[in-house]
Amino acid sequence: VIFLTPTFLGDRLPGWWGKIFPAGGIRLGLDLRGGVYLLLSVKAEKAVEHELANIKESVKEELNRDKVLLKGFENHDKALTLNFFSKSDLEKAKKLDSNYKDIADIDENNLSLSFTLKDRYITEVQTRAIDQVKETIRNRVDEFGVVEPTIQRAGADRILIQVPGASASDRERIINIIKRAALLEFKIVKDAAPNQELLLAKYGVKSPDELTAQGLSLHSGDTGQENEKFFITENEAKVTGQYLSDARLVFDEYGRPAVGFSFRGEGATRFGELTGENVGNRLAIVLDETIKSAPVIQERISSQGRITGNFTTDEAKDLALVLRSGALPVPVDVEQEQTVGPSLGKDSIEKGRLSMIVGGIAVVIFMIIFYKLQGVVANIALAL
């Protein structure tokens, strides 16, 4: 009885109770308290693409440093192929073997060098990405202030999330916080137009994919400007959200909610270089592939800035939260999503309480009838 009392009375217990008896109740699950249930599928294969992209950038830097002329790159599933103009350049590039032999099989073919990621390393990369998704989601849920969430792996590439006790008003916010990729990038704007067809025609291409060969990217815009629904930016983001030291709710000069951000050491240096080299140009603030704002750079900025948009106060708070927690390293799909009401749990608790009372009374009566005086003594001892 003493151990069960905190479960039924909770905050109604007197202050002295915890000093004498256990004050922690039984943790009630989703079926009893209601809340949020999500089953996420992690696109772990994207982690392999990201790893190949990182290898590509590293190789490019090493070859440029050694003044090796490179014709181009080709991506094939889990392989990266380097094409050279001459045999001498290929021979110079072979020294890369020692840097990547532990993670990739390296093959030579005419004027090409191919790096094929080893299966063992692919598994390691994917596992690391799934674990990082799990920890990022845990950080987001914990920072939201939810008590006792359950976040765990479910099979090879799935994550199960249960948030018991979430109020009806918080459930939608929690789901959005969990699902959001929160990939923040800063890119220089090259052009803008009310529709993408105008931009594609202007740059002589038929699809956004063809812009990549020109070092450009097409993004939709959510800036509130009707004549700027689509933007073309530089493909490479020299600064991303990984360099943020803080993100917080602020208000702009018109009193509208916004998100203020600050950079740490290397991020401040990178952001300062990006803005300093592009004074007079527009800087796109890209969130999950959508441009939220694109202000003109008036002067060099190094340490902090602001993301504006059509945010409510809660939306700005939630965006700041996910930016502080970090972006998901790979996309996730929601396979199952349920919000469970507490009514079923309330009925179960009431039935459990009633059955415990009825059962307890039945035991007391049985012991008195069967054991007489000894039964009375035993009942008193149990009560104490």
What are these model-predicted stretches?
Residues 260, 264-279, 283-284, 350-384:
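Interfacial segments of transmembrane alpha-helices in multi-pass membrane proteins
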